[in-house]
């Protein structure tokens, strides 16, 4: 498997920064979390309806589909600078860390020094090639999120879906996610208007 490094080591800088993350009201946290890619604690989502897993790309709004393709084009080119340009062309720079980092390329190179940061592009491709979900419909936080694991309880995954998960994470990663109660590896969120809101890992 390409992603042999344990999950904790791969996202350690991001997880460390969570200690400093400010806490506002529940409503503010919910809205901000949806836009930033934060994973809600398992207890907060108990009883919530599980969104439909979508694989048909034709169901994406045109602007969402175009943004996804621009991201994939940059990632497949193996060019971090090209991906940065896509981020900068966005309405707002997508959330790429829950910490205070200002330079995504510097962060990715620090997390994946062996590949000089390029491993993040492979992860991004894998994430955007999985099924996705359409969440927070009809609200300002409406979003298309990849991979669907971010909004589907791990205990409900079929064997086939677990194999798909293992393309992104190791068995050890999966065990840690089960202990936490949710998928906490990289995910992408793009709004119906094509705005790319986040590409983050962590909870």
Predicted features and spans:
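C-terminal-biased regions
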Residues: 31-69, 81-203
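Short basic-aromatic helix/loop recognition motifs at nucleic-acid
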Residues: 72
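Bacterial N-terminal signal peptides that target proteins for export
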Residues: 1-12
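Bacterial N-terminal signal peptides
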Residues: 10-20
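Boundary at the C-terminal end of the N-terminal hydrophobic targeting segment
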Residues: 25-29
């Amino acid at each position: 498997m390409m992603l042999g490094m344990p999950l904790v080591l791969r996202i350690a800088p991001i997880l460390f920064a969570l200690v400093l993350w400010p806490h506002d009201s529940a409503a503010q946290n919910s809205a901000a979390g949806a836009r930033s890619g934060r994973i809600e604690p398992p207890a907060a989502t108990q009883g919530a309806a599980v969104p439909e897993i979508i694989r048909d790309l034709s169901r994406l709004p045109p602007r969402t589909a175009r943004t996804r393709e621009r991201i994939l084009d940059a990632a497949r080119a193996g060019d971090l600078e090209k991906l940065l340009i896509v981020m900068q062309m966005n309405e707002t720079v997508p959330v790429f860390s829950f910490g205070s980092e200002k330079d995504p390329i510097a962060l990715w190179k620090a997390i994946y020094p062996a590949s000089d940061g390029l491993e993040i592009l492979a992860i991004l491709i894998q994430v955007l090639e999985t099924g996705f979900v359409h969440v927070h419909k009809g609200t300002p936080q409406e979003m298309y999120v990849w991979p669907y694991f971010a909004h589907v309880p791990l205990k409900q995954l079929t064997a086939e879906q677990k194999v798909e998960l293992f393309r992104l994470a190791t068995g050890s990663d999966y065990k840690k996610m089960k202990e936490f109660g949710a998928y906490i590896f990289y995910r992408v969120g793009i709004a119906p208007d094509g705005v790319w809101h986040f590409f983050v890992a962590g909870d």
